[in-house]
From Swiss-Prot:
Its EC number is 5.4.2.7. The gene is deoB. It comes from Agathobacter rectalis (strain ATCC 33656 / DSM 3377 / JCM 17463 / KCTC 5835 / VPI 0990). Isomerase that catalyzes the conversion of deoxy-ribose 1-phosphate (dRib-1-P) and ribose 1-phosphate (Rib-1-P) to deoxy-ribose 5-phosphate (dRib-5-P) and ribose 5-phosphate (Rib-5-P), respectively. PANTHER family: PHOSPHOPENTOMUTASE. It catalyses: 2-deoxy-alpha-D-ribose 1-phosphate = 2-deoxy-D-ribose 5-phosphate; alpha-D-ribose 1-phosphate = D-ribose 5-phosphate. Pathway: Carbohydrate degradation; 2-deoxy-D-ribose 1-phosphate degradation; D-glyceraldehyde 3-phosphate and acetaldehyde from 2-deoxy-alpha-D-ribose 1-phosphate: step 1/2. The keyword Zinc does not apply. This is Phosphopentomutase.
Length: 395
């Protein structure tokens, strides 16, 4: 018989809690997203994360851990070879990525790829380099509007991103070009993890702002995941934020797109008030997209505080047979050099009103304990070829 009727997994995108032993292999030394935010800001107003045990797990600044935490907590290492969104989320649901996705950070995309993209989209490509999304629209937005061209850029992640001004490029046309790019980059030598539409508005430099109409075109997971197993067993698998994009809709029964992380939490609170049996899987991207990549410590800290307020509302509404899991998919230390993700441990914090006391549980060597624990709870077998083991008995 299942222990929990509904499980809520909330991914605080990029909220890492310290460098993994192999982080230097990924170009990351002494990284610690949450720890360094606490160090810089000294205090954060996070009463709900505190009582769940976040500061017992990882403390810093002038903060104090809870005397009697109500959550069960540990840190998870990443077994996969990567530090990106897809690799992290796929691993949570049982897929270990051995071979990292193709990146084009150093020299941009090959001329052959760009030529094919220009031919099929009917637009000249400008940019074609690794850049911050906000900086590249400042640099090239006016040129794109004037000449009807198309800004293409990448990052240290395995992504091809296309910017389009909603007023002159047209949103549907931007999505069409991204669908073309997705097909082109299915070739092995150009195989990127995600193609992302990055729409923006504004007429001139200094006025350009990205909108919430972003859309991700991800590769399908390389195998079946815990999500497929849950859906195939007749359970609800509700996604909030970019989860549906990350899994290419695989294993999802209902999807909600979010305009922001605050909106994502509001959607989750609404879902909590409805009846369902299964999983609600949530990604809150603003920690990463707005603050981590932009190396904005204060913005990141304030985003955590905003999350904490809504976390308190959600916790009140949880039923006795609900389980809440908080985690992250990688790090993105806003105090570190560059603009890219950082290879870090992630938190695992579990809470239910029916739990008999909180405290530390054993550290785990993979994010995949999350998917394995969820399927175990519902008496569902994980698909062949997946990794991970259940820690349901510890919750």
């Amino acid at each position: 018989m299942k222990k929990y009727n509904r499980i809520f997994v909330i991914v605080l995108d990029s909220l890492g809690i310290g460098a993994m032993p192999d982080s230097e292999r990924f170009g990351d030394t002494d990284v610690d997203t949450f720890g360094h935010i606490l160090e810089r800001m000294q205090t954060l107003d996070i009463p709900n994360l505190t009582r769940l045990g976040m500061l017992n797990l990882h403390c810093g600044g002038q903060m104090q851990p809870a005397a009697e935490p109500i959550g069960r907590f540990t840190r998870l290492a990443e077994a996969s070879n990567g530090k990106d969104t897809m690799t992290g989320h796929w691993e949570m649901m049982g897929i270990k990525t051995e071979k990292p996705f193709k990146t084009f950070t150093e020299h941009g995309f090959p001329p052959e790829l760009i030529a094919e993209l220009e031919k099929q989209c009917g637009k000249k490509v400008i940019g074609n380099k690794s850049a911050s999304g906000t900086e590249i629209i400042e640099e090239l937005g006016e040129e794109e509007i004037k000449n009807g061209s198309m800004i293409v850029y990448t990052s240290a992640d395995s992504v091809l991103q296309i910017c389009g001004n909603e007023e002159t490029f047209d949103l549907q046309n931007l999505y069409r070009c991204c669908e073309i790019a997705r097909k082109i980059t299915l070739k092995d030598e150009w195989r990127v993890g995600r193609v992302i539409a990055r729409p923006y508005v504004g007429k001139k430099k200094g006025e350009f702002v990205r909108t919430s109409n972003r859309h991700d075109y991800a590769l399908k997971p390389t195998g079946l995941t815990a999500l497929n197993a849950l859906k195939d067993s007749g359970l609800d698998v509700i996604s909030v934020g970019k989860i549906n994009d990350i899994f290419c809709g695989e294993g999802i029964t209902e999807a909600f797109r979010s305009k922001s992380s605050v909106h994502g939490m509001e959607q989750t609170i609404d879902i909590c008030e409805k009846d369902f049996t299964g999983l609600c899987f949530v990604n809150l991207v603003d920690f990463d997209a707005l603050w981590g990549h932009r190396r904005n410590v204060t913005g990141y800290g304030e985003e955590i505080e905003k999350f904490d307020k809504n976390l308190g509302i959600l916790m009140e509404k949880l039923r006795d047979d609900d389980l809440l899991i908080l985690t992250a998919d990688h790090g993105n230390d806003p105090t570190y050099k560059g603009t890219d993700h950082t290879r870090e441990y992630v938190p695992f914090i579990a809470y239910s009103k029916s739990m008999k006391g909180g405290g530390a549980i054993e550290e785990e060597a993979t994010f995949a304990v999350i998917g394995a624990t969820i399927t175990d709870n519902f008496g569902v077998k994980m698909p062949e070829g997946t990794i991970g083991h259940s820690i349901l008995e510890e919750l």
